[in-house]
Every structure is written in C-alpha cells, then in structure tokens.
C-alpha cells in the first residue's frame, strides 16, 4: 500500500518484482514486538483470513488456508500477547500470518480493509488497530449475508456447536470481541471527524466495489454508518453525532 500525500488516500500497488520468492518464518525476530502491536497485527492477520473466507471468490485451497490461520490465531495470539518470548506461540502466529496472506492474496478482502485503508490514509490510524476495531462491527453489519460462512467457521474452530447459523455466527463475532477486550484493544477510534466521513465512505465504497468480492454490496450511505459505529465521541462531539442513531 502507498499513500498519496496530497489526497491522503491509500492505494494498493503490485508488480511481479514485489512478490517474494521465499518467506522465512523465524519466530525469534518477533520476540521484541510490544504486546499491543502483537495484538493488533495478530487481529489484522485474523481479518485477512476471515475476509478471504467469507467473500464470494474463494477456492478450496484458500478456504483451507484461511481456516487453519483462524484456528492458529484463536489458539496462540493470546499467549503471544501475554508472553512475547513464547517461541511456540510466535511460530504459530507467523504461520497463521503466512497462511492468511496466501488466502487473501487469491481471494481478496472486504469492507473491513476498505474502511481501514481510508482511515489510515486520512488520519494515520495504524492499519492493524483499525482492522481490529472494525472487524466485529462490520461482520455484524453484514447480517444474514455472512451468517452461513461465519457459522461454518464457528463450528470448524470449536467456537459454537449450534445448528442455527445466526446463533453460531453471533457466537463467532462475540469471540472476536472478547479477544479484543482481553488484549485491551478499544471499541472505538479517536480522531474521526464527521465532516470527513462522506468522503471516506466514498473512497471505501469505491475500493470495495468492484475490487473486492464482498458478501453484500452496501454503497456509500451504508458504509458511512461503519465510521459512526467506531467513532470515538467526546463531549464536544456528542451533540453533533446525536443524529446518527448507530453511534452511541
């Protein structure tokens, strides 16, 4: 990703010269990563895997990689956060990141990334933090369009044994919220200005449609709601945001 310094808009770039021949997964180089960066980069990898899985352009190989990545993250991220020198947890998180990368490189991502890119470009919000906060919010906003695949993930990873897709999907999203909570990841993002949201939503919508095979297409109006749902509101902003019922 690159950021246009004039427009503060992020763009994806790619070229065969940028594609590595090898990926070296050496856990020791991650031992010094601070807990909060461990948490948010780990949730970023989780976002890669989940968005690759629930999109409408998947293949058996990418689904398999995504599921393995999700399971590894569920099993190891908290340990890596608690103890940065846990070699086993660090090794499994590196593998999870790699697998999630192979999955989304072929099957793409979704609205979580589209919104996160706009926030990073405009405000410099760290990408992993933006994804961490947005992931459960947008998965919930997808509603029934994502229930079947989220429910399948919930059952495959042992999060739910419910036969009802809506219930299993809800338990999966709740598990993600609890992961964020356990690693002190906030529920909102500071600095989002009301006057910027329509422009940011247009950027995100243009990125998601037609670039990403998202579970459901929203349009700018629906996308705007995602910014309000994660917008940190202080006392000066509260009255201005009262017109947006999706934001407390």
Please annotate each region the language model reported.
Residues 150, 160-248:
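C-terminal charged capping/lid subdomain of soluble metabolic enzymes
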Residues 64-68, 72, 92-95, 114-117, ...:
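Amphipathic alpha-helical interaction segments
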């Amino acid at each position: 990703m690159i950021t246009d310094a004039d427009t503060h808009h992020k763009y994806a770039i790619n070229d065969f010269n940028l594609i590595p021949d090898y990926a070296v997964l050496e856990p020791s180089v991650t031992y010094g990563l601070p807990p909060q960066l461990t948490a948010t980069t780990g949730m970023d990898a989780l976002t890669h895997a989940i968005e690759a899985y629930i999109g409408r352009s998947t293949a058996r190989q990418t689904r398999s990689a995504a599921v393995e990545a999700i399971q590894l993250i569920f099993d190891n991220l908290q340990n890596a956060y608690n103890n940065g020198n846990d070699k086993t947890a660090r090794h499994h998180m590196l593998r999870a990141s790699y697998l999630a990368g192979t999955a989304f490189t072929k099957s793409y991502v979704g609205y979580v990334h589209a919104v996160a890119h706009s926030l990073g470009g405009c405000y410099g919000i760290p990408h992993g933090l933006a994804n961490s906060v947005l992931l459960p919010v947008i998965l919930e906003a997808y509603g029934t369009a994502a229930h079947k695949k989220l429910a399948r993930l919930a059952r495959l990873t042992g999060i739910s044994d419910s036969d009802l897709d809506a219930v299993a999907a809800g338990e999966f999203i709740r598990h993600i919220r609890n992961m964020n909570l356990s690693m002190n990841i906030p529920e909102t993002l500071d600095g989002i200005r009301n006057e910027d949201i329509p422009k940011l939503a247009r950027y995100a919508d243009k990125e998601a449609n037609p670039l990403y095979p998202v579970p459901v297409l929203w349009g700018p109006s629906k996308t705007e709601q995602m910014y309000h749902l994660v917008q940190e509101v202080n006392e000066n902003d509260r009255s201005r945001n009262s017109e947006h019922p999706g934001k407390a």
